[in-house]
Structures are given as structure tokens and as C-alpha cells.
Amino acid sequence: MESILTSIKLLLGIGEDYTHYDPQVIMHINSVFSTQLKQLGVGPEKGFRIEDDNATWMDFIPEENEEVTWDGVKSYMYAKVKLMFDPPTSSSHIKVLEEIIKEFEWRLSE
């Protein structure tokens, strides 16, 4: 299974081997894990955090099921981290990302 950090970096357009922004990306990923996803009831009850590129999506959600899919969680994580780490300059693009986030929050909370 793929690394959480690596998959989000690639979605953000950051190369896997480029580590300069890792601390900031990790901070934003952990923020999403500790606040939004935990409040939505997704993932371990005690919470989850990463420290490097060793943590995988399988560590966060041990097995994919009908209620929560890895792709839904990954897309949600990407959209949230994108808004915090590298927000779009266009207000219409920001609005689209915010609407996507709301849709995923609704779907993940069911």
C-alpha cells in the first residue's frame, strides 16, 4: 500500500524525492487526521498521525469497506491539504475545492 505522505505530495505536484516541504505537508496532513477525519468518525478512535513517509493508508484504515473507501479519504485529504498548503489564487477555484470538501464530508460521515 502506498505512503500517505508520498501520495499527497504527488497529488500536490511535489516529487517523491523532494523533501524540502515534508514538514509542512506532514503538519497539514496531521491536522486533517486530528480534526476533520476524527470528527467525521473516520479512522482509529484514538486518532492517527504520521511522522514520515512510512505510514500507509492501510495503517490508517486497515481494510477498505463499503462505508469508507481509501480513494474518498485520499481525495478529501488532498483537497484539505491543498487549501492549507498551496491555496489556489482564483476565488472560483477555492470555492470549487470547498464544495468538493463539503461533499466528501457529507459522504464520509454517513
Predicted regions and their residues:
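Conserved short "hinge" loops at termini or chain/domain junctions
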Residues: 1-69, 102-110
